[in-house]
Amino acid sequence: MTNCQNTSRDPQGKMVDIDGILYQIIDGKLYRYADLTLDKGFKIVLGRPGSEEILKNLLNRLLGVGIVHLEYRSSEYPGMTEEDRTSRFDIYCRDKNGSSFIIEMQNWSQKYFNKRAVYYSSLAVQNQAVEEYRRQKEELKRDWDYDFQPLYVVSFLNFRNWTLDGCERRSNEYVATYRYCDVETGNELNDGTNLVFIDLDRFDKTIDACDSLEDMWLYSIKNMSKQSFCPNTVEGTEVEELFRQAELAKMTEEQRISFEISVMSRNDMLNSFRETLEAAKEEVKAKVLAEGRAEGRAEGLAEGRAEGINSVIKQMHTKGMSIQQIADIVEMPVDEIQAIVQL
């Protein structure tokens, strides 16, 4: 991703050739590959026909399952209210054994993201129930007996997975799988429900530090849009195909425009936060100076400014920004941002 002059902000989906490589210009930056941390980029790259093999390899590697074949299914479900007519997953698919996989990219923090995953799992069970009931009715068999196939709700989190905070060191720092179990013995219910949270925010390895295919998958998903080439260490591995599929030049104009709108919307939100932060700084400065106190004025100004910044940082986090995103905007260390949001 490189800076480039952008004369129009109307989404056009057009490509430019630079040294034999096609890039898309969005808000003055060059993108060779889609940003997979955005819902739209994630769905276009991993949720369209032709991506089944890539998605299969990704899930097998991160979940430790043995998927042989995947089939995309409709990602729409009836909504809870008249205003919200449908719930839409990023990706919904089944394997040949009937196991269901709901895959979501969550770019903004949500207070109840864990409960949202539970809700999505219930929709997958409901879908299996309806299909099985209809099948057995056609075959003149008895009603469905609640024996649903395994289901996985896989959430890629571009914010901190707070469910892991304070936990003992895990063998896998980035992928957490939850199942129903007895609270005293830990024995699993074995109903087939799997809630998987993949913490991209916690993953901070460089490409040179990636020493496994799992690391390469996580690195590539998190940093795809920043690349101009497929890294040497990724070439020849199962992850290389992800780079080929994510090339914007290989997408339709409609897909590129959709992705461009998504990037612009995110940039607008981030710019709004930056403006709010600057306004808070000026407001605090004016308030302290207006008090006209000769003694302790400098100290009061510093304290007031810090208080104002802390307030804005908390607002940014409440509205769904990750710790890393906030740190990038306010130009402060990640650990300091973490401490402020926990105050």
Residue ranges of each PLM-predicted region?
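Low-complexity, glycine/alanine/valine/leucine- and proline-rich hydrophobic stretches
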Residues: D182-L200, S212-M224
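Short, charged alpha-helical interaction segments and adjacent helix-coil junctions
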Residues: T2-Y31, F101-Q106, D208, D215, ...
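Non-catalytic, well-ordered alpha-helical scaffold segments
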Residues: D39, E52-K56, F148-L151, D211-L218, ...
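Intrinsically disordered, low-complexity regions enriched in Ser/Pro/Gly/Gln/His and often acidic
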Residues: C167, S171, C210-D211, K222
